[in-house]
Amino acid sequence: MKSLLLGAIWLYQKVLSPWIGNQCRFYPTCSEYARQAVETHGSLRGSALAAKRLCKCHPWHPGGFDYVPGAVPGAEPDQEQHQCTPLCNHHSEDHSQ
């Protein structure tokens, strides 16, 4: 099943995609994301990840970088490093003087 999916993705990338042009608002493109997802996570989970990505690829989504989880080492942010913290705490004081 995995090789069948990868073959379909390859066919799309080599035949259909050049003909219709690059319309994807993400990096990597949705077809490349699907290929990496199937390679990394197998047919079932890879297809689910690809379907989720395709649902986000529309004009109302800003797009940007969206890597397959676990496919690109170092591409996923360190959760502790990106914790939201308040810049200051003086906003809780009363400034109505």
From Swiss-Prot:
GO cellular component: plasma membrane
Swiss-Prot/TrEMBL keywords: Cell inner membrane, Cell membrane, Membrane
Entry membrane topology: Peripheral membrane protein
Tagged with keyword Membrane: yes
Residue ranges, annotated region (Disordered): 72-97
Record's subcellular location: Cell inner membrane
Presence of the UniProt keyword Cell inner membrane in the record: yes
Pfam families linked: YidD (PF01809)
InterPro entries: Membr_insert_effic_factor_YidD
Main location: membrane
Function recorded in the entry: Could be involved in insertion of integral membrane proteins into the membrane.
Family: Belongs to the UPF0161 family.
HAMAP family: UPF0161_YidD
Name recorded for this polypeptide: Putative membrane protein insertion efficiency factor
Organism ancestry: Bacteria, Pseudomonadati, Pseudomonadota, Gammaproteobacteria, Oceanospirillales
